[in-house]
């Protein structure tokens, strides 16, 4: 697991669930906590009930990764790999690459990638709705 791989280097992961419990209950916070516990994911898990964090960060998908340096500056945003539904077929490891490059003291080659996953479930909208200004990042 990526979080375990980088833990010894001081990297910490935090999951934030911004999905509306009213739109798609399968992805609500409690359901995802159950999944977190089942798979023993090694990170803190927070709930963005108001969806203000998702709006502030511009979150489009779940998951949508954000990497911050020690100065809390955003240095990477986007996907983990290019085939999240089938890990063995991946050809790109964007999140791992970004972390390795940063920890080696190098500039991140691709600091912006398109997140891949289900859309954030917005309160008061149907489950596949996306904001009108949402688009691919690159």
Q: Positions of the model-derived regions?
A:
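Extracytoplasmic/periplasmic, Sec-exported soluble proteins
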Residues: 24, 57, 87-91
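Residue-level detector of short coil/turn "hinge" positions at structural boundaries
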Residues: 13, 43, 61, 108-109
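Short secondary-structure boundary/hinge segments and terminal tails
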Residues: 24, 54, 72, 119-120
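Short, internal strand/loop/helix patches
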Residues: 32-69, 74-75
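Flexible, glycine-rich phosphate/dinucleotide-binding loops
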Residues: 22, 74, 83-84
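Non-globular targeting/processing and membrane-anchoring segments
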Residues: 8, 79-138
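Structural microenvironment flanking redox-active thiols in thiol-disulfide oxidoreductases
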Residues: 1-38, 49-54
């Amino acid at each position: 697991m990526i979080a375990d791989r980088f833990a010894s280097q001081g990297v910490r992961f935090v999951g934030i669930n911004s999905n509306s419990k009213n739109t798609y209950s399968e992805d609500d916070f409690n359901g995802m906590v159950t999944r977190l516990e089942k798979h023993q994911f090694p990170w803190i898990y927070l709930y963005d009930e108001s969806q203000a964090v998702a709006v502030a960060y511009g979150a489009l998908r779940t998951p949508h990764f954000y990497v911050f340096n020690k100065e809390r500056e955003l240095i990477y945003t986007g996907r983990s790999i290019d085939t999240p539904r089938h890990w063995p077929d991946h050809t790109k490891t964007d999140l791992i690459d970004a972390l390795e490059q940063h920890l080696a003291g190098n500039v991140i080659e691709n600091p912006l990638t398109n997140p891949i996953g289900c859309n954030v479930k917005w309160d008061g909208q149907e489950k596949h709705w996306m904001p009108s200004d949402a688009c691919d990042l690159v």
